[in-house]
Each structure stands twice: as C-alpha cells, then as structure tokens.
Swiss-Prot record:
Catalytic function, reaction form: NAD(+) + ATP = ADP + NADP(+) + H(+)
Protein name: NAD kinase
Keywords: ATP-binding, Cytoplasm, Kinase, NAD, NADP, Nucleotide-binding, Transferase
Entry-linked InterPro entries: ATP-NAD_kinase_N (IPR017438), ATP-NAD_kinase_PpnK-typ_C (IPR017437), NAD/diacylglycerol_kinase_sf (IPR016064), NADK (IPR002504)
Predominant place of localization: cytoplasm
Gene3D superfamilies: Probable inorganic polyphosphate/atp-NAD kinase, domain 1 (3.40.50.10330), Probable inorganic polyphosphate/atp-NAD kinase, domain 2 (2.60.200.30)
Cofactor(s) required, per the database record: a divalent metal cation
GO molecular-function term, one example from the UniProt record: NAD binding
Active site per UniProt: 61
Keyword Magnesium: no
Length: 284
C-alpha cells in the first residue's frame, strides 16, 4: 500500500481538523506512503486516473454510496470510516481509525465484493443510466394515489401491481428501505436481487427474491402520471411518459476493504436490529 486516496465529507470537517489527523496517523504508520486528498466536487475522474491502492471515504452511508457509484468501474477498493449518523455500511468508526490503519499496513484486511444495480430508460431522445449500491425505488412522489405497473423478469410476465411503488434492492440495500417496507435481510455477499412492493393491494404481493442475473422490466405506467425513481435515496428523477424501465445487475462489483476482525452480524445486530443508542451518532 503506497498510494492512498482520501475524501472527507466537508460538512463533517469544516475546519480541516479531521484531515490533519488522518494525514498524521497515516504518515506515522508509514512515512513513504503517498496520501492524496480529493475535494467533494468532481473528484472521481481524478481518482480513477491516479489509481490509488485504496480509497478512504469519511462520512455517513451517503458518502459511501456516492463513492461506490462513481468508483465501481475503476475497481478501486473503498475503506469507509463513519463520521456520520448511523454508518451501517462503514468498515469502522472514526475512533478506531488509528488502530485500523495499523492493521491495514500489517495486511490484516480482506476485500469484499458487493452486487450493484444498473437502471436505464429512454426519455425523449436520450438514454438515462444510473448505478446503485442500495436500491432503485419507483414511486408517485408526494401524491397520495396508487400506482399501477407491470413487472417482467427475463422477458416473462411476473405480475401487475397496484401499490405506492416498488423497491428493487441489492443484498447491501436489503437493510435499508427494503427492510422498512417488510422485505427480508439478505446476506451482503450473495448475488441476488429483491423486489418489494410498497403497501401493495392484493391477496399476496410480498417480496420476491431473484437470481442476480435476472433482468427486470417495469412497464404499463400511465403516461400521464407523475412518477419518479430514486437511486440510493438521491434526488428524484422524473420518469413521466417513460414506457420501460430496465433494471439489472451491473457488470462491475463494488469492492470494499474490510478488516479481518470485521463482524457483519455484530454490526447488523447493533445498528439495524437493536438500534442501540451508542450507534445512533448525533441526535436529529
């Protein structure tokens, strides 16, 4: 490990205190390592060009999701440090950073690959493509009105739905909106995709878990309806008038760097199942 890229959520480090500490810790552990700090805006192309051995993202889950979407095609491993609220996706908490860097330079780490989704559709004369580590959500925005749509899997009709929307989730995203909507927790290493309708009508319209190779098509949406998608909880994208929305596994996988003593079930239990207060971070 000779070259390390770093991005710190500037909202969490307005005076640069964390940045100074991070550089100090890394240099104390290994003097000849090159540490490159990247600003918030438009840094991803530069990261892909410089190709650091791994990339450290300091922030909450949003920071990690953003890094994953933008760095996945470069194959650069991401080591995530929580300085946000919950930080379920983080490899470590900020207080453990010094010990973590020591372990990394001793080789006490492994790489974990996570499935990502590709969402695409044609609107007007242009094709829109989005990447997701957590989920793609189709919904009606702020309208309290039911949404009607059809789901095809691998060009075979699955079901027509009446619901408030639908969540198409990766295993990584299964503990996010999917779980809140009644979907299952899926172990993050598995190559699966889950479909969870939001408040559906019908005798059974629960989650279906599909093979990761499945191609999902959403169609049959009224062209006059105001309908949106969100990808990993980002700004909504208007899909009014779109005939088909296609969702499938991305050809690349997100590569995460984890310490050898990382315990997924401990993090799951504390931060998702029990939601203990010490994992809550700052109060709302």
């Amino acid at each position: 490990m000779k070259n390390i890229g770093v991005n710190i959520n500037s909202c969490k480090d307005p005076d640069g205190t964390i940045r100074k500490y991070v550089e100090k810790v890394i240099k104390e552990e290994k003097k000849d390592v090159q540490v490159k700090f990247y600003d918030e805006l438009n840094y991803f192309d530069e990261v892909c060009k410089t190709k650091p051995d791994f990339f450290i993202a300091f922030g909450g889950d949003g920071t990690i999701l953003n890094a994953a979407r933008n760095l996945v095609s470069c194959g650069i491993p991401i080591f995530s440090v929580n300085i946000g609220h919950l930080g379920f996706l983080s490899s470590i908490e900020f207080k453990d950073f010094k010990d973590a860097i020591h372990k990394i330079f001793k080789g006490e780490y492994f790489f974990q690959e996570r499935t990502m989704l590709k969402c695409s559709f044609i609107k007007g004369n242009s094709k829109k493509v989005f990447y997701s580590l957590n989920e793609v959500v189709l919904y009606k925005g702020n309208m309290a009105k039911i949404l009607k749509y059809n789901i095809d899997v691998d060009d075979k009709f699955y079901m027509g739905f009446k619901s408030d929307g639908i969540i198409i989730s990766t295993p990584t995203g299964s503990t996010a909106y999917n779980l809140s909507a009644g979907g299952p927790i899926i172990y993050p290493n598995l190559d699966l995709i889950s479909l969870t309708p939001i408040c559906p009508q019908g005798p059974y319209a629960g989650t279906i878990v599909l093979d990761g190779k499945s191609n999902i098509t959403i169609s049959g949406i009224d062209a006059n309806e105001n309908v949106f998608i969100t990808v990993d909880g980002r700004q909504p994208v208007d899909v009014k008038g779109v005939s088909f929305i296609e969702i499938s596994k991305l050809n690349y996988k997100c590569k995460l760097l984890k310490l050898k003593d990382y315990n997924y079930f401990e993090v799951l239990r504390k931060k998702i199942i029990l939601r203990t207060e010490e994992c809550e971070g700052d109060k709302y």
